[in-house]
């Protein structure tokens, strides 16, 4: 069997499709939260439990994927080149997202005419987000990449810290050459076991999506959407514009269709829609990107790093929310103020993780740093932040997926034939049963023998 051999598709009954299961769960969650809000709020542990299950497996998966990818490479200089190109891409595209958010909010002006008195706003609800020290400086962010201990990084699940350890371990293992084969094989087999566990966890994804959506609608209600509908509509429109125009053009220039790519990750998008966290599908996205033809090393470096440096949806949200607050409170923002805001956001936006609520914390820190826009205005959008979090997470997910393919192509680590095959046939078996891919990989590994 060749490396590019196509896995025979197994047509599953519709009710066994993860996409259908999650879609059904989200709809039921919305209905329960709307008609029985008290019961809906009590469903929160279901969503929290699912995200905790995923988080417990993220650190070891990143470690194994990156170590195997780096240790198995012949040209070690390529690792540095891949990381450098990824950071360059992240900076350019996230900056474009910030600018697009700024342009759209100035054109549509969703906060104009609200005439809110900033001094009369009750700030008790946002006190937890605006407390001193909630978000550190750039130096703090960089220093936090270095863990206190190796165990501490894994215990806390700090993605960038685990990534640093994995890169160092991979380089060290590579230097051992043939003497490190036993360790290499153990880590590779372990990664297969971990992805099988992910397959088990994803079977309860519909329950997690149901619980999270029931809680969101039950706690915040549909009414909160209507009161600030113009901002919500503007934000969702901007995210769609960014995904299908900006990312669509990037995808087209690199030989694939954004529409086909979105269809390919439809299960992940629905899970993120339900949980409002792009982290909930991180392991599954790594597996799916690898099976699109991207090399393991590239996937292991780009996806985890992107969760801190390539949050396109969060970037759009930050500029739009900041200017919206200024418009709603009649705070004048001239071109100088807006450029200053943009420059500050270029730094603070890199401190947002791919978890629910992080964007709001970054926004609070940014408004405090800029000083011109009243921080009290955050209370205006607190009620709908959870709903906007869903669009942020969805955009972040698509953005990181596209980034992986683009960087893989730049570094020559992309099998374009496999990419085309997978996108043209998105209903392949791995979309429903990740463990089948692992069986396929094991079979290939047994045929090829050693690394």
Curated annotation (Swiss-Prot):
- Cystine pairs annotated here are none
Instruction: Return any one Pfam family short name.
Output: SDF
Q: Carries keyword Thylakoid?
A: no
| Primary site of residence | membrane
What kind of membrane protein is this, topologically?
Multi-pass membrane protein
- Superkingdom of the organism of origin: Bacteria
State whether keyword Translocase applies: no
A GO cellular component annotated for this chain's UniProt record is: plasma membrane
Cite the GO molecular-function annotations of the record.
Answer: fumarate transmembrane transporter activity; malate:proton symporter activity; succinate transmembrane transporter activity
Segments crossing the lipid bilayer: 17-37, 53-73, 85-105, 153-173, 193-213, 231-251, 306-326, 339-359, 361-381
Localization (cell): Cell inner membrane
Supply one GO BP term. L-aspartate transmembrane transport
Q: Which keywords has UniProt assigned to this entry?
A: Cell inner membrane, Cell membrane, Membrane, Symport, Transmembrane, Transmembrane helix, Transport
Q: Which HAMAP family match?
A: C4_dicarb_transport
Q: Which family does it belong to?
A: Belongs to the dicarboxylate/amino acid:cation symporter (DAACS) (TC 2.A.23) family.
Output the PANTHER family linked to this UniProt entry.
AEROBIC C4-DICARBOXYLATE TRANSPORT PROTEIN, PROTON/GLUTAMATE-ASPARTATE SYMPORTER
**Summary of the function given for this chain in its UniProt record:** Responsible for the transport of dicarboxylates such as succinate, fumarate, and malate from the periplasm across the membrane.
* UniProt-recorded name of the protein: C4-dicarboxylate transport protein
Tell me the organism.
Paracidovorax citrulli (strain AAC00-1) (Acidovorax citrulli)
Q: What is the lineage of its organism?
A: Bacteria, Pseudomonadati, Pseudomonadota, Betaproteobacteria, Burkholderiales
């Amino acid at each position: 069997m060749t490396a590019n051999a196509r896995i025979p598709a197994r047509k599953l009954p519709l009710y066994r499709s993860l996409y259908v299961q999650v879609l059904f769960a989200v709809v039921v969650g919305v209905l329960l939260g709307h008609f029985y809000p008290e019961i809906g709020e009590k469903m929160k542990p279901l969503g929290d439990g699912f995200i905790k299950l995923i988080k417990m497996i993220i650190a070891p998966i990143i470690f194994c994927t990156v170590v195997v990818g780096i240790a198995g490479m012949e040209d070690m200089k390529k690792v540095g080149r891949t990381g450098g190109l990824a950071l360059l891409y992240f900076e350019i595209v996230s900056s474009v997202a910030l600018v697009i958010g700024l342009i759209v909010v100035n054109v549509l002006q969703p906060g104009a005419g609200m005439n809110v008195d900033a001094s009369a706003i009750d700030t008790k609800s946002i006190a937890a987000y605006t407390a001193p020290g909630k978000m550190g400086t750039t130096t703090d962010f960089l220093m936090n990449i270095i863990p206190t201990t190796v165990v501490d990084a894994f215990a806390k699940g700090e993605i960038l810290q685990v990534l640093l350890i994995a890169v160092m371990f991979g380089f060290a293992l590579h230097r051992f050459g043939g003497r490190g084969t036993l360790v290499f094989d153990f880590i590779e087999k372990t990664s297969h076991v971990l992805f099988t566990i992910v397959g088990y966890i994803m079977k309860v994804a519909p329950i997690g999506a149901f619980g999270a959506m029931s809680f969101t609608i039950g706690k915040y209600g549909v009414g909160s959407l209507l009161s600030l509908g113009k901002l919500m509509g503007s934000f969702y429109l901007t995210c769609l514009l960014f995904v299908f125009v900006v990312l669509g053009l990037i995808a087209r220039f690199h030989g694939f269709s954004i529409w086909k790519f979105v269809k390919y990750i439809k299960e992940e998008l629905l899970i993120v829609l339900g949980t409002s966290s792009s982290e909930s599908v991180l392991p599954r996205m790594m597996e799916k990107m690898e099976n699109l033809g991207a090399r393991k090393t590239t996937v292991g470096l780009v996806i985890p790093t992107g969760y801190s440096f390539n949050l396109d949806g969060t970037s759009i949200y930050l500029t739009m929310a900041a200017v919206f607050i200024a418009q709603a409170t009649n705070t004048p923002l001239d071109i100088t103020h807006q450029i200053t805001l943009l420059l500050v956001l270029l730094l603070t936006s890199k401190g947002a993780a791919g978890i629910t609520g992080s964007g709001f914390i970054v926004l609070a820190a940014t408004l405090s740093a800029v000083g011109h826009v009243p921080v009290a205005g955050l209370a205006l959008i607190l009620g709908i932040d959870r709903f906007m979090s869903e669009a942020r997470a969805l955009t972040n997910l698509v953005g990181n997926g596209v980034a992986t393919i683009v960087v893989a192509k730049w570094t020559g680590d992309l099998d374009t034939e496999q990419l085309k095959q997978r996108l043209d046939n998105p209903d392949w078996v791995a979309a429903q049963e990740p463990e089948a891919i692992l069986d396929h990989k094991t079979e290939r590994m047994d045929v090829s023998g050693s690394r």
